[in-house]
Amino acid sequence: MLRKLVTVIALATTPAWAAQASAPFTGADYSGRYECTGQDKHIGSYKGVVDMALDAKQSTGKYAAYTFTLTLEDKSRYDGMAAGTSDALGVYFAHTDPVLKDFGVGVAQMTSTPEGKVSFVKYYYTPEYEGGGHGLEHCVKS
């Protein structure tokens, strides 16, 4: 009897939002390939390419979810994910070699170049890599 009562109470108090389907994605889609230059505390200047793809199943309303890969000129690769809205993304990334402990978080501000190309500036923080570090990356959609 007590079990039935608890079940009824649990079902009756389930929030209405829990049963609703996700709203379709209506935000900006920043998917694509970006040419990047950066300045890192440890490696100095670098160049690379970011390939970013919208995860449509996890994007809803104005909120976007992405997966991405940054490949540097020396073929080092970082896999990551981002989530955001409008013109700002929160970012997580990690080098494909976990032994390096080269992973971090960042914030990316989406904008347009004077020529009208989509671009972003990303500030990032790497807490473990060689005692910690940070960097700034400028990327333009190609």
Regions found by a protein language model. Name each.
Residues 1-6:
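Bacterial N-terminal signal peptides that target proteins for export
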Residues 10-19:
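Hydrophobic h-region of N-terminal signal peptides that target proteins for export
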Residues 20-142:
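Central antiparallel beta-sheet cores of small beta-barrel/beta-sandwich binding domains
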